[in-house]
Amino acid sequence: MRAQDHAISSVKAKLQVRRLNFYYGRTQALKNIELSIPERKITAFIGPSGCGKSTLLRTFNKMYTLYPEQRAEGEIWMDGENLLDPKQDIALLRARIGMVFQKPTPFPMSVYDNIAFGMKLFERLSGAEMDARVDGRRHPGPLWNEVKNTLRQSGICLSGGQQQRLCIARAIAIRPEVLLLDEPCSALDPISTGRIEELISELGHEYTVVIVTHNLQQAARCSDYTAYLYLGELVEFGETQQLFMKPAHQETENYITGRFG
């Protein structure tokens, strides 16, 4: 009943998940996940609370290593490297795979220093090079138009929506290969949500973006591909339009039509 191999043969895969299982202590949260995430596309993870969406997302940059009782088994490949190899440099991995969380997390420093923070950690840039990277020409228009006149203002003084867009700018400033978004709009009003969605759509042209969302309309609007998870299993994965209009599994149809969830 569950799909076993969800590779998208017509596009290049950036992340390849193979036989992935995940545990919180003795509780298994992900069960034998097989999935290929297309490069420079937007992939949405949907499903009811507790289905494993965020857990799967956080295996990509090994956020779980912060908690000793959590562990992953299997393989996640990116550009010929198994990201679950214990020899992986976690700091560099998280530079390659950026992440934005549900609640905005601006640092208590200026907008400029927020955006430059990662560059100072991972790169040796001159002041002029740093200024050029922070410059708005490096960021999507909707973001830059709001913060260009407040670079010396504290990031924590921005509105909630602006703070979240600042966190996205901070994540992409170090030029990651993949951007993970864990319910980035759940704490925002509809107008701020619309602006974030516009920004996500722009980012999808340059980055491999993976977003977890409870908002089915958001998944339908923003993503190129969608994965539906239930009870730790990957039920269905495919092009978003196809999955929403003509899902291959009854369970998927029940969820997206509101009969279940």
Curated annotation (Swiss-Prot):
What's a Pfam family this protein contains? ABC_tran
| CDD domains, sorted | ABC_PstB_phosphate_transporter
Which GO annotations describe the biological process of this protein? phosphate ion transmembrane transport
| Keywords assigned | ATP-binding, Cell inner membrane, Cell membrane, Membrane, Nucleotide-binding, Phosphate transport, Translocase, Transport
Q: Which domain of life is it from?
A: Bacteria
> Which residue ranges does the record assign to the ABC transporter domain?
15-256
Recorded topology in the membrane: Peripheral membrane protein
> What SUPFAM superfamilies has UniProt attached to this entry?
P-loop containing nucleoside triphosphate hydrolases
Q: Name one GO molecular function term.
A: ATPase-coupled phosphate ion transmembrane transporter activity
Enzyme Commission identifier(s): 7.3.2.1
- Tell me the compartments it is located in: Cell inner membrane
Q: Which reaction does it catalyse?
A: phosphate(out) + ATP + H2O = ADP + 2 phosphate(in) + H(+)
User: What quaternary structure, including any partners, is listed in this protein's UniProt entry?
Assistant: The complex is composed of two ATP-binding proteins (PstB), two transmembrane proteins (PstC and PstA) and a solute-binding protein (PstS).
Functional note: Part of the ABC transporter complex PstSACB involved in phosphate import. Responsible for energy coupling to the transport system.
Q: What family is this? A: Belongs to the ABC transporter superfamily. Phosphate importer (TC 3.A.1.7) family.
What NCBIfam families is this protein classified in? 3a0107s01c2
Q: What is the name attached to this protein's record?
A: Phosphate import ATP-binding protein PstB
Gene, per the UniProt record: pstB
